[in-house]
Amino acid sequence: MAYVSMKQMLETGVHFGHQTRRWNPKMRPYIFGARNGIHIIDLQQTVKLYRAAHDKIVETVAAGGSVLFVGTKRQAQEAIATEATRAGQYYVANRWMGGTLTNFSTIQKSIERLNRLETMFSDGSVNRYQKKEILTLNREMDKLELTLGGIKNMERLPQLIFIIDPHRENIAVKEGRKLGIPIMAVTDTNCDPDLIDYIIPGNDDAIRAIKLFVTAMADACIEGEALQKDTKNKNLEEELKQIATAECNKESTSIEQELIIASEQTETKENNIEESVSEVVITNESELITE
């Protein structure tokens, strides 16, 4: 398990918050001080809280859950899309559509539409339409891909949401809280930490700082996936052992039953022989007496 170090956080500027005039007083416990009108985040707390968040992601994925990565600001888009894909998770990197979670059944219809359009273009069936109609369908597909591409394979709601800048992604936060989905977020000094279940105090504007955390959380997902596979393999081995043991017990019981039956048959034969011998002896004695 490789955690991000405090040195890495310093090198990527995680400790730089917003201007002191643009702050949320609720973030006071996570602020070390101020320098040149900029709040400085207490990295000792960031390290501790980041590790707790990292472990939560590992635990969630290891248990078979999924994580939704959210970051639509320009600085976060590339890292969110790239790292979530690498980890085999879902993401929203462009625009959060209202109801993405709270109205998931309707969103799924749009996803189905996107999948149908992609199929039409891939198998060539779109060619039966006129050129103008094809252009219209292509624009529709591109638009849907832009907003839903990162969740088009998401068949059920995620078990955890990881957010860059919850102040900007306030709708995603509200939807997650309404559905009881845990929220984890890189939270700058202008955010409300009370809305976040797993807070990671840090710079949510610098590209390097964002990439550091997004990559770390993607690694945590991969780690959890590996643990999940190990658990499945162990469970499979245990099941196979139980089956083998049951078969052995069944075979042993069958052999014991066969031995008992054979023993009973032998005993019966011996009794029959004894009875036959007795009958012969009695017959011979009777003949001798008669003579």
UniProtKB/Swiss-Prot annotation:
Biological process annotations from GO: translation
GO molecular function, one term: structural constituent of ribosome
Pfam families tied to this protein: Ribosomal_S2
Keywords annotated in UniProt: Ribonucleoprotein, Ribosomal protein
Cellular component, GO annotation: cytosolic small ribosomal subunit
Family: Belongs to the universal ribosomal protein uS2 family.
Name of the protein described by the UniProt record: Small ribosomal subunit protein uS2
Organism: Lawsonia intracellularis (strain PHE/MN1-00)
